[in-house]
Amino acid sequence: MHFPLIPMVKLEEIKQIFKPKLLPIIWNKTKLTLLDQSRLPFEKIYVDVTKVEEVSDAIRTMKVRGAPAIGITAGYGMVLAIQDSISLEKAISDLTKAKKILDESRPTAVNLMWATSRMLNKAKDLVEQGNAKSVKELKELLEIEANKIFEEEYEAELKIGLYGIEKVNDGDTILTQCNAGGLATGTGLGTALAPAKLANALGIKVSVIAPETRPWLQGSRLTVYELMEENIPVTLIADTAVGLVMFKKMVNSVMVGADRILSDGHVFNKIGTFKEAVIAHELGIPFYALAPSSTFDMISTVDQVKIEERSPDEVRSIKGVYISPKEVKVYNPVFDVTPPKYVSAIITEYGIIYPPFDKNMRRMLGK
């Protein structure tokens, strides 16, 4: 287990050196400006939202995607909820209604409910303790809280990126999967893409190979676009080319994000991750999962985690055009699970965790 402390000066330094070129979420006091990810990569369009209903719609229609990005967006949505509140009592009522509206926009998004609960509880505490004596004061203090949600996420990603750089050498090529970048987290940095972005900002030349990631094509639509915006060399490959690029030694390491990591080190991530891990293990290529500690599930066993399945038409068609018989049976799991034997290390904001994961993860979390 490797837990070097990140000197604060180094963290502050990297904040000055790296400035994201792609900002998916922009807050401007009375409005929230969102990059419409459903239109990428062919159209870069920002939309302004000023009402809770508009924020909910942006989440529901995938203008905003990725659990951390949804949480950040919801936090600012709660601030917008009291723009027109006429009293503190009405503000709490408006926030309660806003939480319900936002939570229903993506019922399975844990970060969404976490953010709206945090904002509502903060508002109640401020009013009950007399720290907000007017709606104006309450709005200002809630805006500070929403900014904290953003800043905490960004700082965690910076730390993940700095720890990840320890696994990168000048001239390396990293293989990734799906989109675990700043578009998914809302900060412009990301988790699995953070080491490549920070390395290049520090003058360490790193390139990335991105599989297309069927059926939603997050690799070709989002990861490639995001890295090109940051001027980081990236090569797009078909999902079926993953084995060959590793066999030909075109890859020095594999870095992926994670939707859930169990206490024993099982990693749940976008479908296709397991394949990369097995091939990397066979060929002696290190495989790293990069994720914040909020991703850890210290309770569930691998058999208890349900893997989501999506519409068969996502596989049968591309953008409404069928590429197979409409009647064919389809199995379309969104995620797969990588056993811990294939995971070289898990990189978090607290440090790098090596096997045995069940022991070292609990040590890190103090459990």
From Swiss-Prot:
- Metal-binding: present as a keyword of the record? no
Record-listed E.C. numbers? 5.3.1.23
Q: Which residues bind substrate?
A: 65-67, 106, 218, 269-270
Gene3D superfamilies on file: translation initiation factor eif-2b, domain 1, Translation initiation factor eif-2b, domain 2
Q: Which reaction does it catalyse?
A: 5-(methylsulfanyl)-alpha-D-ribose 1-phosphate = 5-(methylsulfanyl)-D-ribulose 1-phosphate
Catalytic residues, chain numbering: 259 (proton donor)
Recorded GO molecular functions are: S-methyl-5-thioribose-1-phosphate isomerase activity
Marked site positions, Transition state stabilizer: 178
**Is Isomerase a UniProt keyword of this protein?**
yes
Top-rank taxon, per record: Archaea
Q: Which UniProt keywords apply?
A: Amino-acid biosynthesis, Isomerase, Methionine biosynthesis
GO BP terms: namely: L-methionine salvage from methylthioadenosine
Its biological purpose: Catalyzes the interconversion of methylthioribose-1-phosphate (MTR-1-P) into methylthioribulose-1-phosphate (MTRu-1-P).
Q: Matching NCBIfam families, A to Z?
A: eIF-2B_rel, PRK05720.1, PRK05772.1, salvage_mtnA
Record-stated family: Belongs to the eIF-2B alpha/beta/delta subunits family. MtnA subfamily.
The protein depicted here goes by the name: Putative methylthioribose-1-phosphate isomerase
